[in-house]
Amino acid sequence: WVMIVNKAEKSGRVYMSLEKTKPTDYMRTVQDYPVEGVNFYDINSLFAQPAWNQVAAELSVEVQTRYNRTGDLSHVVGIESRGFVVGAVLASVIGVPFIMVRKKGSKYPGSLLQETYALEYGEDTLVIQEGILGYTNRVLIADDLVATGGSALATKRLVEQTGATVVGFASVLNLAYLNTDDMKSQPLITCEEIIK
């Protein structure tokens, strides 16, 4: 695998394209799921392939190069549920703690902060344990996929409630044609971008 990195200077985004294989080559697309008109990119089919190890390693290297070598990153936050896989791998490789942001109603003890956001097909609420992050922390938010950016931006607001600073986002796949203007302005490292 050879990584070609194209850095968009103004937005701070980094798109990595795999010269031989793209993550979507290993991802099943399910049409009209979870509701009609929505296409679901099933990253579980990528996780089940040896190619996932290479994708995770390359994403980790780019994140580490961009953030952690300068000491600009103290934690990785993963968004439930597939963001747990991506985020935990990034945190482990980089050598920083991993924090989970969960969906409201999940088993998460203690006092919680919450943030509600709109989905393409409804709304949802995310929670984080109060006191798990603080003012000195600098956080990267990780998920499998960014579409509108609703859950990513809600997680950003949630992390900011703790007093921590969000330095950027990382994902395996970015559906750029669905990104809101707010999401387009955020620093993002992604393995593959779909423009449509």
Task: Label each residue range with its predicted role.
Residues W1-K196:
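PRPP-associated nucleotide enzymes
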